[in-house]
Amino acid sequence: MNIVKTDVPMTSQLCHETVLALAERYPSIRAETMTETDFGRPVDLMMMGKGERKVIFTAAHHANEWITTPVLLKFAEELAQALESGGRIFGVPAQTLVKAATIYIVPMVNPDGVDLVTGAANRREVARAAVFAENYPGIPFPDGWKANLNGVDLNLQYPAGWLRAREIKFAQGYTRPGPRDFVGRAPLSQPEVKALLLLTEAVEPDLVLAFHTQGEVIYWQVGGIEVPGARRMGEEFSRLSGYELADTPEESAYAGYKDWFIQRYRRPGYTIEAGLGENPLPLEQFDKIYRDTLGIMTTAATGLPGE
């Protein structure tokens, strides 16, 4: 019987309980809490494998993109099941994968925001967010919410052109806490982001994947920086998923997790914009999203021949 639920809206409690249950059921999954949000919700981390190659997968930087969380949870569960049965995942022997790679999975970077969008936030939190939302009446509430409960967009918090991101977003009118695109008062001001940055600095991974929605597109570079091997890997991701491989738009090329990673380490980093439609995407899209991205996750972990 599967532990990961893919047919109900995701909440921070469901994510946390799922992570704990997976770690209890499968010895191949190790779990810990990276940090807590300002509102006391845990930001979970799962680790699998003990290989030399290191990769970090993240999901739900943005609240209304929570469908990416069960994608990573299901990947972890299917890999653990394949290890138990001596089977394969996306055609790759599970034992081969975990001997080659160590996989770090952060399934929900923004638990506060996710709870707001999926109806699990408490009354006081909803009221606080509603006040922020009043500054942006053109954004649906709560479905248009991407930020955390401080009204800060977590994927605009990294020290990679943060001042330029602020300039762009302020010019677009995002000058105060709200549902989306507010960069905060300073980079790394939010504990969720600081914890992920510290994890990344501790691990120094060979590659990172940041799962978002939507558009069925893969963004692979930033600021004209072309990391050796990154295009080749991106083209393979595109082939496996059917997603377009695209340059990051200039207005979105600053202060994001993938942007910071590429600038900091000159290693491959990818934003995976899964699914199609208007966020939050319906759960009816989950199966297709998972099928489309399973090869990306598996190949990111194994690497390409000759790497």
What are these regions (language model features)?
Residues 1-18, 25, 164-307:
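C-terminal accessory segments enriched in acidic
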